[in-house]
Amino acid sequence: MEPRKLSETTPEDYARLGMKSGLEIHQQLATRKKLFCRCPVIRPYSEEYDAEILRHMRPTLSELGEYDGTALMEFKTKKEIVYQIRQETVCTYEMDDTPPFELNEEALDIALEITMLLGCNLVSEVHIARKQYLDGSIPTGFQRTTILGVDGSIPYKGRRIGIRQLGLEEDACREVSDVGHLRTYRTDRLGFALIESVTYPDMRTPQEVAEVAQLLRRLARSTGKVHTGIGAGRQDVNVSIEGGRRVEIKGVSRIPLIPLLVHNEAFRQAALLEIKAELERRGVTAASFRADASNVTELVAGTQYYPLAKALRDGLEARAVVLRGFRGILSWRTQPETTFAKEISDRVRVIACLNRIPNIAHSDQEGETLSSTEWTRIKKAARAGDRDTIVLVWGDRRDVETGAGEIALRARDALDGVPNETRQALPDGTNGFERILPGPDRMYPDTDLPPIAITEDRIERIRSIMAERP
């Protein structure tokens, strides 16, 4: 289906795409203390801090002895993580120097109230699990989380939207900056009690997704026991179309942004499936796929293309990756004002930490680029044919090696259509690569805290003061 504007797309168009969407709504609870320690919850946040701590993150094996793909991806970035800490808002628990305190009972009561408002079946015992986070947003490398209820629903326009589960977990740090191999966080909101309401993929149009998000937000606010304001509530949106895969758009801060984000993601997936079909038509398969990399620094030493020329003046190197059979593919439109080349550039930016844009050039691109003579010279040296595309990447030797590998991996993923990814919501309604979508191997039991029984007395006490559920 040809891409079109949101305002020109009908529910029937989304039905033809087979679009489905679900939500993960995160909402801070208005507790006095944090979830697993007794540090105060202070809002609004402060920009002041008393000290900095440096950490490096490394993946650990899951309960089944396997590594999570997202954790391995984050480890590949070789990031140094700096935490800006304020004595008033953190303790040794957040820095992973002491075990957790008992679960905050006030937070548990509020979370159970919202779980019942969503009509979920309550668990009989609370079991804490650990969810790996190797991006550094939690100093321990994992988030403590628990499920409180499953299989609920809320009414919406004559039907019901299913609630898969509601969980209670600790909030992560606030990111300050992410440049090269250095990522900086502030720890003031770290450990805040947070609920995560997860719906089934029951929404069929972008507008429905936004309206259901609004319903869930209003329901949580009806308790009067949640924080409001910037950063207190965040939405993750899951989108898939027929033939595609679930893609998570992470951290949507404003509900009005949701329709355009969902619309663009649906048509991005349609474009990726068209690319897959075109590669199949050309006979490019997993068995025949080739991506050959070579150092071409000397071949482009005199280039006038400014981004590359500056890198070479700084003593960096250039590497060319030949994608066999990919001619024209990188110029294929995937989102408004965006082509498949950005799918590759994003991977290089995030994983190889080459975040000075542009970080790649390719032989099919129009506008400012290398001269035709330089491209011909590279093609000849790399033995590229008329059906091939060359992607050039430049930077520090170690990062360029990683970048060349990511170019090949993302091109290989094109043969499968839509990769499972977590993607970042951008202000213009498009999205960009953030990380590989996590799998079940990121979860494992927490051994520091015992189970907590959810008694009938507790349920009745909460039910006696809660609002009537929809």
Where are these regions (language model features)?
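Basic, nucleic-acid-interacting segments
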Residues: 1-466
